[in-house]
Design a protein with these regions (language model features):
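Short acidic-glycine motifs
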Residues: 1-480, 484-487, 505, 509, ...
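Flexible internal linker/loop segments at domain or repeat junctions
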Residues: 492-510
């Protein structure tokens, strides 16, 4: 009998950080004296004085799920001109689960021992003997199709179907079930630990850690770190998309077919992590405590440390014993003040999508060596909560519906292949030029939308939610036409900061995430290829092919900076007003609408690759 023990451990990385504080004079307290700071981090390292760090418990975590599907379909030729297709598919998909139920989530009503018994503790499927989410058992997807020959050269086609996506994959790392035990120095100049003394036993957390007080860090509860996963109760519901189309197919002339169709779909239950914030301050919570976000005095109170006199009537009114006095009043009033995060939901199927399009396609079937396809799409794509960074106010959910960040209303694509025929009576010349294949794919379309800039009014310090700048009506969004091919990025900014205004302190912005007329430069994609197969005998052939990208060598500049309309314009001569005069500015180096010319082109210059392959 032979054997060998195998043990695979994950999450074994940790952190020891060293600071100047441990080798500085205590009275200095990080002050700058004579232009220099006191203390030296490398000296702290040599002495083994650790300022802060993290100990990750080793873990052996495994998440998985199950999926089955059944389908049936049939085609019924009702008459010589009418064909009817029908079918149904059933999907059953579970949500990801840790094999032994060690993945944590939040129990809103359970007392948290680390937070003095305040509601909001951690539970595990292995300890609650429950399932975090429900599995959707009704994912039936019918499919219907119809084709009717109106005339010998004209066919009407229509279709309808319901399709289901899979549930989420296991988007959790080992740290989700084995949180890092972060530690910090108890005071200025004092080490959190020494390398000579090793890691203190109280810094070590067991694995698995199934404590209801696993968050915040039991050894350092003032860090207010929250759980990394809040499993949504509907995590077992797959996304659903309802699709339909109707169109006409017509043979215009011999070997040329035209297709025109309306194609649409509606999606629901797509994964979203941005439509909920379980730990934000709402108007109802503020009203309960007699606070008004529109009152400047109340805003000052919310931003004040709860242990300071600026907190007013909230001074030292701690939500639980041990709550840090340096935390703000706003933090203390959160639904779960023991956590500083928004408690993002995991696998929440709340996103929605909309798509409507007119699609036309012309197909030149193979004849005389030529195959040609031209496709044109005129579409509108909208989404709600599916794409990151696109929610302005989750409490007014439908206000966040906007065009998709991948929206391209107009797209044209040409693809063609042509095989050169025999040329002339000269056999040698004909043999050289014949059978070469020339292919191309040319794609043209609208530019992608630019995300509205995020406000800098610090609303997140009050309500723990961000917002957007306001769009100023009637003010042009651009200073230069992004598609004119006439921009000098060293001298010109392309976006207009005056088109945006910052909401007032404590106010929500009114802008949508995306606007149809606020887009980046159009990005053509043009490629071409040349090739031929030389056959020597039946079993031997040489393939020669040359592929070109950006065949017309177009210059495409980088996308402009569009994050902060209040950002100062900078140039080699300085910043601010001096940069507005091209005669004195030198070269631009930053600002709202700045195109970073130092980063090179958005698309590489024309390049080609030669491929040769010999088969035998």
């Amino acid at each position: 009998e032979f054997g060998y023990p195998v043990q695979a451990l994950a999450n074994t990385n940790g952190l020891f950080a060293f600071s100047a504080n441990q080798t500085a004079q205590p009275y200095a307290q990080s002050s700058i004296i004579g232009g220099r700071t006191v203390g030296f981090p490398y000296a702290s390292f040599l002495l083994g004085l650790v300022d802060h760090g993290a100990i990750n418990p080793v873990a052996d975590l495994r998440t998985g799920k199950h999926f089955i599907a059944l389908f049936a379909q049939d085609s019924w030729k009702v008459t010589r001109k009418l064909t009817f297709d029908y079918g149904v598919r059933y999907d059953y998909d579970t949500y990801p689960r840790e094999q032994y139920g060690r993945l944590p989530t939040l129990a809103p009503g359970l007392a948290n021992p680390t937070a003095g018994g305040h509601p909001g503790a951690i539970i595990y499927e292995s300890t609650c003997n429950c399932s975090f989410a429900k599995i959707y058992p009704y994912a039936f997807g019918p499919r219907l199709g119809l084709a009717y020959q109106i005339t010998p050269k004209t066919v009407f086609r229509a279709g309808f179907g319901v399709a289901y996506d899979g549930t989420a994959t296991a988007q959790t790392g080992t740290a989700s079930a084995a949180p890092a035990n972060n530690f910090a120095a108890p005071g200025f100049g004092d080490p959190a630990m020494t390398l000579a003394g090793g890691v203190p036993s109280n810094y070590l957390l067991p694995w698995p850690n199934l404590s209801p007080g696993a968050y915040p860090n039991p050894n350092f509860p003032t860090t207010l770190n929250g759980p990394t996963s809040i499993v949504d109760q509907n995590a077992g519901r797959p996304a659903r998309q309802t699709q339909w189309s109707a169109g006409i197919q017509r043979e215009i002339v011999s070997n040329v077919v035209l297709d025109v169709a309306y194609v649409g779909n509606r999606g629901a239950w797509w994964l979203s992590s941005i439509l909920d914030n379980y730990n934000a301050l709402t108007p109802q919570i503020l009203a309960h405590y007699g606070l008004d976000i529109n009152n400047p005095n109340d805003r000052a109170t919310l931003r004040a440390p709860i242990g300071s006199t600026a907190a007013g009537r909230f001074q030292n009114q701690l939500p639980y014993a041990g709550f840090p006095l340096t935390a703000t009043v706003a933090q203390a009033l959160r639904p779960f003040p023991q956590f500083s995060s928004g408690l993002t939901p995991l696998w929440a199927p709340e996103g929605r999508t909309w798509y409507d399009s007119l699609q036309a396609k012309v197909t030149k079937r193979y004849s005389h060596g030529l195959i040609l396809d031209y496709a044109f799409t005129w579409a509108r794509e909208e989404q709600l909560g599916v794409e990151a960074g696109t929610v302005n106010d989750y409490q007014n959910r439908m206000q966040n519906k906007s065009i998709s960040g991948f929206s391209r209303p107009i797209v044209s694509v040409v693809s063609a292949n042509y095989v050169l025929p025999k040329w002339g009576p000269n056999k040698i010349f004909s043999e050289i030029v014949r059978d070469w294949t020339i292919g191309t794919v040319l794609s043209y379309g609208s530019g992608l939308p630019i995300l509205s800039p995020a406000s800098t009014n610090n609303l997140s310090t009050l309500l723990f939610r961000p917002t957007f700048f306001n769009r100023v009506p009637g003010v042009p969004l651009y200073l230069q036409n992004l598609n004119c091919h006439c921009i000098d990025p060293t001298k010109q900014l392309v976006l207009n900061p005056a088109a945006w205004s910052n909401p007032g302190d404590g106010q929500w912005g009114t802008a949508a995430p995306y606007y149809n007329n606020f887009r980046y430069e159009r990005r053509p994609a043009e490629s071409m290829s040349f090739g031929r197969v030389f056959r020597f005998r039946e079993s031997m052939a040489l393939t020669v092919r040359m592929n070109f990208q950006n065949i017309f060598n177009r210059t495409q500049l980088q996308n402009p900076s569009a994050t902060n309309p209040l950002a100062p314009t900078t140039c080699t001569a300085g910043s601010g007003a001096v940069c507005t005069n091209p005669a004195t500015a030198g070269l631009l180096t930053g600002g709202f609408g700045f195109v970073n010319y130092l980063a090179g082109d958005f698309v590489s210059p024309r390049q080609g690759t030669l491929e040769m392959r010999f088969q035998f």
